[in-house]
Amino acid sequence: FGMKTKRKTWYLQKKDILYVEENHDGKYGAKGQKRLPKRKTTPEDIQRVNRWNKSKKAKIRLMEYFSPGDLWATYTYKPENRPPDMDTAKKQFLAVMDKLRKIYRKRGRELFWIRNIEKGTKGAWHIHFVINDIGDTASLIERAWPYGGVYVTQIRKSNCPEEDFQKLADYITKDERTREKKKDGTLAKPRVSESSYSHSRNMPLPEPVPKELKRCLLYTS
């Protein structure tokens, strides 16, 4: 008997990377089996799906536009320099990226970035972001930030890049509803009271190539 599966394939980094996603088509089931009654969708279900989609899109962009050697950075604020609101923090980050874009352009390079601005539950602000490196980007982003500390690390080459980019995508899309697991398995209280996720406008989401598969299921007595 047949069961239909939908496959989506993303060809990333000029086809150097293939990312494949497969989902069972809920419209079809195995022959002779009754479909389960549809469960009512809860607000928690919607939040979970929205978070999953947000993280997935971030991961695909990370895999398409960034590579090992690019940078994962954090901007922090001294207490006296904390922004009064999210709009101010957005403008401050964009002002830095505008400066960097001009430098990149002079060198014949394009600037890509993904960022998440977070205000902690205790009032501290910081900005996590990924940016493509052109050799001295670490020193460029450090000199351009006058409001506090700068922490930079390289994205390292990995045997499991898809898993690593998934972790990075989950981290950079945190919001007020994100609760991390504690060692005892319980969920910690949210550590973010306000957040804003965004990316540079020159990073369109690659389109997947869809394909419908029919799987044969064998039943034996």
Regions found by a protein language model. Give the residues of each.
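Right-hand nucleic-acid polymerase module
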Residues: 1-123, 133-221
